Each structure stands twice: as C-alpha cells, then as structure tokens.
Amino acid sequence: MYTILIIDDEPIVKIALRSILPWEEHGFFICGTASNGLEAVPLIEKHHPDIIITDLKMPEMDGLELIRFLKEKEYPGEILVLSNYEDFDSVRSALLLGAADYLLKIKIQPDTLLACLNKTTKKMQNTADRKDSILKTGITE
C-alpha cells in the first residue's frame, strides 16, 4: 500500500481528493492532509509518505518552496502537483525541481488521477528494482 499526503489550502479540494477515488481499493492510503507546505513538513517527517499531492499556490510555504525544501532534504518519494493555474512557468519549475507530474484541478477526473498515480508508482517500482539489481550485481553507475 502506497501512502499519500494531500497538501492544499482549499478545504473543498482536500475533501474532493479524499472522495474522488476508493483509495484503498487501488493500493493507496491517505496518511494525512495539510493546508500549506509549512504545516506539511512535520507530517512528512512523521509519516514518510510515498507520494505527496500538493497545490502550488498556498500561504506561508507554497508548493514550489515545499518541493525545493524536499529536494534539499533528499525526500525519496514522488511529488504530484495540482493547481488551478495553467501557468507554464510554474509547471516547468515544478517539473525541473523534481515533481513527477502536474495536473489541473479543474480537469481532474478519477481515471486521470488514477492513471497518474499508477504511472508514478510504476516509476517508483522500476527505480526500486533497478537499485536492487545494482546492489545484487555490484554494478554502479
């Protein structure tokens, strides 16, 4: 079961994300929610979520600041960015900082979110398999 932390300053979005999918039926567990990056940091340290779904525009610590912070701390999980903004610069910045994918809130559908999550978990599994293979064979890059 993959753990997910949802970060968004809009309560309705957090409620919608919790109810958009039967999470556990698809192998996911929502370990918590936060209203901004600053509030999320202790939850990340406590739960070590596999996947973080974060908004970009939030008070106190926005999504880009959170991604930068997590990159500095060498966060091993994946980050999916949700936003209302079709702002190419924000998308590009989030992806360059290491976000796995970017989804628009207004266009999010259960099948779209699930496809994104499945793509992300497949990437995580491939990375883990590759690391295991390297450790077993003693080959380093």
Where in the sequence are the language-model features?
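Two-component/phosphorelay signaling modules centered on CheY-like receiver
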Residues: 11-32
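Active-site residues of response regulator receiver
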Residues: 7-8, 55
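Receiver (REC) domain active-site loop signature in two-component systems and cognate sites
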Residues: 58
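Acidic catalytic/metal-coordinating carboxylates
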Residues: 36-39, 62-65
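Interdomain helical linkers/hinges and coiled-coil/dimerization scaffolds
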Residues: 92-141
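Short hydrophobic/Thr-rich beta-strand motif most characteristic of the beta2 strand and flanking loop
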Residues: 25-35, 43, 91
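Active-site beta3 strand of CheY-like receiver
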Residues: 47-53
